[in-house]
A protein has these predicted regions:
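Short, mixed-charge aromatic SLiMs
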Residues: 48-72, 291-313, 385
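Terminal-proximal interaction/regulatory segments of ATP-powered molecular machines
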Residues: 315-389
């Protein structure tokens, strides 16, 4: 681990940020790829099949209401003493944003058509942080794919935005990198939108809730350390400026082998290419000739968790959340894990579910033979207990 990552980890640990080892590296990888992409669009040193790729690594934090989505955005980019706030990257932070607010629109004011600039244009070369991005949530849902907004996809993919409205047209290019939060739902990651996003998944258990409350308690009274932050910002800014020294990027055969071992879908490999390059830049800094190889223990852990989260999101995070609540809140029996319905309802309130929603989810899982129910006792069957906590 480089000095910069040790400094960031030490600072997040000092701030009592929960699970920083799990989530913070992805934000740093994304920021490194944002800077690499800006450099590559200008210097054009890395190509794929005679095509200049867009190497941005957008991130969506998927978690129930109240469980760290906004906290991580504020800690990594939004607050005055955030990790990337003064690191040479333009950062914008919005509480919520619609598709029109993100892309832009045209409004008629007293008979005059006026173009209203969207966040994707305002922060065309920056990081855009959005606590709750409803347009992304809609575009990723399975039932929405047929009518997915092509301009939202364009802004996050190649960056060439063109939107024709009754009052005229909007056209611009954006290199914005998106960090946003969304609530758990069943998302289609094979869609155009899903293939271009990285995911951070947090499905809390009672243990997580207790630990998070403890971390919040310990964080009270912790003041910013301006000397440490100035050092972190300086090192990050130096890394960003040094992107211009990169001349070649090569992916070794071990990467191809690793993707095979992980059974990646072909449409996932592009995102994982960015993750590996971001990791390399985060760990070693920019180099003249970058050669990326798989096999680093920490890297394997990072990409393993990313693949696991993607699989869980596709299979249904509501099911995974119920499994985790049963495993942590119940008791182990021969058939699997057992919990009473009242106890599960109590656990479900923590993540924003009411008794009716819990009962519906249990009925769905029972039909799929993931759980069995006798009276008020629910058993998570052994065949369904492979979910990691």
């Amino acid at each position: 681990m480089t000095d910069i990552m040790e400094l960031i980890f030490d600072e997040l640990n000092r701030r009592w940020v929960y699970k920083y080892e799990t989530y913070a590296p992805l934000y740093v990888c994304s920021a490194m790829m944002h800077s690499f992409n800006l450099m590559n669009q200008k210097r054009q040193i890395y190509w794929e099949g005679s095509r200049l790729p867009n190497m941005r690594m957008h991130l969506l934090f998927v978690a129930p209401p109240g469980f760290m989505k906004t906290h991580y955005l504020s800690t990594m980019g939004g607050d005055r003493f955030a990790i990337f706030k003064n690191a040479g990257v333009h950062v914008g932070h919005e509480q919520s944003l619609t598709e029109a607010g993100f892309i832009g629109t045209i409004r008629n004011v007293s008979g005059v058509d006026i173009i209203v600039e969207g966040a994707a244009q305002t922060y065309a070369n920056g990081l855009m942080l959005i606590d709750e991005f409803s347009a992304i949530t809609s575009a990723l849902k399975v039932q929405y794919n047929a009518q997915m907004d092509t301009q939202l996809l364009a802004a996050l993919d190649h960056g060439n935005v063109f939107k024709r409205l009754g009052g005229g047209k909007i056209a611009y290019q954006t290199h914005l990198t998106l960090w946003a939060g969304v609530q758990p739902a069943r998302y289609d990651l094979s869609s155009g939108m899903g293939r271009r996003l990285g995911f951070l998944l947090f499905l809390p258990t009672k243990y997580d809730n207790d630990q998070l409350r403890y971390h919040m308690h310990k964080a009270r009274g912790v003041r910013p350390d301006e000397n440490v932050m100035n050092k972190i910002w300086g090192l990050l800014e130096k890394n960003i400026k040094n992107m211009d020294i990169v001349e070649t990027v090569t992916y070794g055969e071990s990467v191809y082998q690793k993707y095979g071992d992980m059974e990646l879908f072909s449409y996932e490999s592009s995102y994982f290419d960015k993750l590996l390059l971001g990791w390399h830049l985060m760990t070693y800094g920019p180099e003249k000739h970058i050669v990326i190889e798989a096999g680093d223990e920490l890297l394997d852990k990072l990409i393993g968790s990313q693949k696991k989260w993607r699989n869980e999101i596709v299979s249904g995070v509501d099911y995974v959340q119920v499994m985790k609540l049963i495993k942590v809140g119940g008791i182990q029996v021969a058939e699997g894990f057992e919990i009473t319905l009242p106890d599960l309802v109590t656990q479900g309130i923590m993540v924003g579910w009411n008794a009716h929603q819990i009962h519906e989810k249990i009925m769905e899982m029972s039909r799929q033979r993931m759980v069995s129910m006798k009276g008020s006792v629910i058993t998570l069957l052994t065949s369904s207990t492979s979910v990691n906590l």
